[in-house]
Curated annotation (Swiss-Prot):
The chain crosses the membrane at residues 17-37, 59-79, 97-117, 127-147, 156-176, 181-201, 206-226, 260-280, 292-312, 333-353, 368-388. This is Na(+)/H(+) antiporter NhaA. It is found in: Cell membrane. One of its GO terms (molecular function) is sodium:proton antiporter activity. Belongs to the NhaA Na(+)/H(+) (TC 2.A.33) antiporter family. GO terms for cellular component: plasma membrane. GO terms for biological process: regulation of pH.
Length: 396
């Protein structure tokens, strides 16, 4: 019995398990969406729980998952990136620049390919930004299926690249797809950020103060019309790091926070996120081949993303603008570049904005195309890295 519990504990702690759990919930949602329970599933996830009258917004269960729970995931990412920037693989500026440059390439090429393929249909030209985003949660989930063979520096490179990608996507949403950005709330968000910077500068070590200001930051960003999960990344990066503090109490609090966030995200938030965002009913896709939209999205994500990410990474290193992460080769960068083609939720979010004034069928086609493209990208990226590390393991 004791051996059983030891094996069970090891299984749940294995990073592969969390990645498989994410994919399991994704396919569970797809399965339910194509059964007689489709209407029930759709009703539950979209049920308006709260109405925010001042901003004419309904808060459904899906909003709670995407706007509130996912903030905790982004908070963990922000803390991790801050750690790597101060004492880890991103401490070297030339290595920290690389994911930013790679992200730029990963946004330019997909958009160009999408525009080239869909140029004959002006009704879908507004969807160019669908292909620029990377879904951090799913990309990391797929990478973690490979388990302990993945170097930590490669995971950090993917996280950093995806963060730059998301920031780019959020800026695109703000400038191209937002009809009513609340400037007052943007100003309030800026003031909250400056306040957090100030208390960090004063070496305040009470973690609860940062959490309180983090809640204020989330609310102000949410009400501004910008995707609220960015508040998690901002808070994580702005929180003080134990490397320049002598407070053992703060260090213990941060260690507990990191451990709690890791468990919560891996085994609860990310699987729920997958379940709420993967429900696509295939019966809505008649005459799919008659539209240029699926081809623009597919080739933008599956080809444009890896070409842009890899090419800009390669040129950046060759022209000595940046350096590769420690222990990482261009072959591994190539594998990661395919995983960047997993657009999924952010791409779906942008498609809803891009085609909100067009018929609903276009949005269904876009969602289906994003799903297929993301699956293909994840399979290619996974197999590429799997066989690469298998080959390295055999050599050693």
């Amino acid at each position: 019995m004791k051996k059983f519990f030891i094996c069970k504990s090891k299984f749940f702690k294995n990073p592969t398990f969390s990645g498989l759990l994410l994919i399991l919930f994704c396919f569970l949602a797809i399965f339910i969406s194509n059964t007689n329970f489709w209407k029930t599933y759709n009703y539950i996830i979209n049920y308006p729980l709260i109405k925010i009258n001042t901003h004419d917004k309904n808060f459904s269960l899906t909003n709670i998952v995407n706007d509130i729970l996912m903030t905790f995931f982004f908070l963990e990412i922000g803390i991790e990136i801050k750690h790597e920037m101060l004492v880890g693989s991103l401490k070297n500026k030339s290595r920290a620049i690389l994911p930013g440059i790679a992200a730029i390439g990963g946004m330019i090429f997909p958009a160009l390919i999408y525009n080239f393929i869909t140029k004959e249909d002006s009704s879908i030209s507004s969807g160019w930004a669908i292909t620029v985003a990377t879904d951090i949660a799913f990309a990391v989930g797929v990478l973690k299926i490979l388990g302990h063979s993945i170097p930590h520096s490669l995971l950090i490179f993917l996280l950093s690249l995806a963060i730059f990608d998301d920031i780019g996507a959020i800026l695109i949403i703000a400038f191209f797809y937002s009809n009513h950005i609340d400037q007052y709330m943007i100003l309030l968000s800026t003031l909250v950020i400056l306040t957090i910077l100030s208390i960090n500068y004063l070496r305040v070590t009470c973690i609860y103060i940062y959490i309180i200001f983090g809640i204020l930051l989330w609310e102000s960003i949410f009400l501004s019309g910008i995707h609220s999960t960015i508040s998690g990344v901002i808070l994580g990066i702005l929180m003080p790091h134990s490397s320049y503090l002598s407070s053992s109490k703060y260090e213990k609090s941060m260690a507990f926070l990191k451990k709690s966030l890791s468990f919560l995200n891996k085994y609860f938030i990310l699987p729920i996120f997958a379940f709420f965002n993967s429900g696509i009913n295939f019966s809505n896709f008649e005459n799919l081949s008659s539209s240029l939209l699926p081809f623009g999205i597919f080739f933008g994500l599956v080809l444009g993303k890896p070409i842009g990410v890899f090419l800009f990474s390669y040129l950046s290193v060759k022209f000595k603008l940046s350096k590769l992460p420690v222990g990482i080769s261009f072959k591994e960068i190539a594998g990661i570049s395919f995983l960047c083609g997993i657009g999924f939720t952010m791409s779906i979010f942008i498609s809803n904005l891009a085609f909100q004034n067009i018929n609903e069928k276009i949005i269904y086609i876009a969602k289906f195309s994003i799903l297929i493209s993301s699956i293909v990208s994840s399979v290619i990226g996974f197999l590429f890295l799997y066989f690469l590390y298998k080959k390295i393991k055999l050599k050693n």
